[in-house]
């Protein structure tokens, strides 16, 4: 079993895992998509408390360390992964897919175990045929649908934040997420 990101409190993660009959200590690792705080809030806590390996690209690891974003952790718990290079955890094959987002080296994850497959793709600013191809044939897809463009534009966010969200390295709108799903 793996976690993808740890952007909520460690207590909430533990409670959620307990609800489905899993223990945090039994996790085989944490797959990190990118270094933004809403994806790594409890990464350091879980790594320290349970000795969980943290799988991330070198760019993401460097950004986490540069910001001291997760506190002091045992360096040996970091596992460098490379976009487009599959790796395994137990009997699960994991394929990191590079994504367009305003982070150091963000990825999505496609996971394959036995005859089952799942993709988790969050914080995506745009998609192209490469992304569409990677999502084909999955049994389960978790895809971000971040905002309604008109509501965002009319909302109270500062102009620069709106531009960031709407940009190619921001977040997919609900409409664009729907269009992507229609191609899968």
Task: State each model region's role.
Residues 1-20, 107-123, 140:
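Conserved beta-strand hairpin/beta-sheet module of binuclear metal-dependent hydrolase folds
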Residues 4-7, 27-35, 54-58, 119-122, ...:
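Active-site neighborhood of phospho(di)ester-bond hydrolases with catalytic His/Asp-centered motifs
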Residues 103, 120-129:
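Active-site glycine-rich loop that binds ribose-phosphate moieties when present
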Residues 22-25, 46-50, 72, 134-137, ...:
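Short, conserved loop/helix-junction motifs that constitute active-site signature segments
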């Amino acid at each position: 079993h793996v976690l993808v990101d740890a952007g909520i409190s460690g207590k909430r993660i533990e409670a959620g895992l307990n609800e489905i009959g899993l223990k945090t200590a039994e996790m085989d690792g944490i797959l990190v998509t990118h270094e933004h705080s809403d994806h790594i809030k409890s990464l350091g806590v879980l790594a320290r408390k349970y000795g969980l390996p943290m799988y991330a690209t070198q760019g993401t690891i460097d950004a986490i360390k540069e910001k001291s974003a997760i506190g002091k952790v045992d360096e040996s718990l970091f596992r460098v992964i490379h976009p487009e290079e599959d790796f395994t955890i137990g009997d699960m094959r994991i394929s990191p897919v590079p994504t367009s987002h305003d982070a150091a080296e963000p990825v999505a994850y496609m996971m394959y175990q036995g005859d089952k497959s799942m993709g988790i793709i969050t914080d995506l600013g745009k998609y192209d045929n490469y992304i569409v191809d990677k999502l084909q044939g999955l049994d389960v897809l978790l895809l971000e649908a971040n905002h309604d463009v008109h509501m965002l534009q009319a909302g109270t966010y500062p102009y620069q934040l709106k531009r960031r969200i709407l940009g190619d390295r921001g977040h997919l709108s609900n409409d664009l997420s729907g269009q992507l799903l229609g191609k899968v």
